[in-house]
Design a protein with these regions (language model features):
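Active-site regions of enzymes building and remodeling cell-envelope glycoconjugates
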Residues: 1-5, 46-50, 91-94
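A short, GP-enriched loop/loop-strand-helix hinge that lies immediately N-terminal to
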Residues: 22-61, 74-79
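Peripheral (often C-terminal) accessory segments that flank ATP-dependent C-N-forming ligase machineries
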Residues: 228-253
């Protein structure tokens, strides 16, 4: 139904009609554009949107906003302008409003850089990060307390989604990044971020999103039910995290 695309001018009217007909009271957005749209329009929607603030959704949706917001922290990657003569190759190019590594390219020189800019609009240029990549699943309660940080691998990627992922140890470096993000954005409920090591083996921030990720199910097997926690949290019901301490590997076709 074309009326139920957020690009449709009548979307909110038809969406509210659907919510009323099916007596839906809570919405879990699982796509960045939809989460951003619903957060901005929560006042017009006849159900509770389980996501973070408008600020957190906007900053996390656009890479330029994300990197500008965290530019004073050492985990923010180097960002170049296309006109800069100081670019250190190789560099990584990606859409400002992209996700999951889609339409991402490595450029080894100015010719390749200009080629990609001639074919794709709205690209940003960052330093190339050659090291290990992780997703980090988090949960922040309605009081702003970061209650859970769960790093996991991205071993097999399809469509920008981790189809094989293993829980790994939480280090002080990852904990610092998570707490810094949480202290700088108005986050509420489940959220996640992705990091990758640079040439000096330090993690740099790739992206973040104030929603549930596709592979948060890794930690569901450790007792962390992000969906249920977020449901209680959306109603200002205090929750506690009880994690089973054993490694988990998730693999799917």
């Amino acid at each position: 139904n074309e009326n139920l695309y957020i690009s449709n001018e009548q979307f909110i009217y038809y969406f509210n009609e659907l919510l009323s007909n099916f007596k839906i009271e809570f919405i879990y957005p699982t796509h960045d554009d939809i989460a951003n749209f619903l957060a901005k329009n929560q006042i017009h929607i006849k159900a509770k949107v389980i996501t973070s603030s408008i600020q957190a959704n906007h900053i996390s949706r656009f890479k330029k906003e994300t990197y500008y917001h965290f530019k004073n922290y050492d985990f923010c990657p180097i960002v170049y302008s296309h006109e800069s003569k100081e670019i250190k190759f190789p560099v990584f190019l990606k859409p400002n409003d992209g996700q999951g590594g889609k339409e991402g390219f490595v450029a080894d020189n100015f010719n390749e850089l200009n080629f990609y800019f001639s074919k794709y609009k709205n690209l940003i240029i960052t330093e190339f990060l050659p090291g290990e990549e992780l997703s980090v699943d988090c949960f922040t309660d309605f009081k702003g307390n970061l209650l859970f940080i769960g790093p996991r691998t991205r071993e097999r990627i399809q469509m920008g989604i981790s189809f094989r992922s293993t829980s790994v140890e939480l280090t002080e470096e990852i904990k610092y990044i998570a707490n810094t993000i949480n202290n700088n954005l108005k986050l509420n409920g489940a959220w996640f971020f992705q990091i990758k090591k640079d040439s000096h083996y330090k993690y740099k921030l790739l992206e973040l999103a104030p929603r549930q990720s596709s592979t948060m199910g890794v930690y569901r097997h450790s007792g962390i039910n992000f969906a249920l926690l977020s449901f209680f949290n959306a109603q200002n019901i205090p929750v506690k995290i009880l994690k089973n301490e054993y490694p988990i590997k998730l693999d799917r076709c």
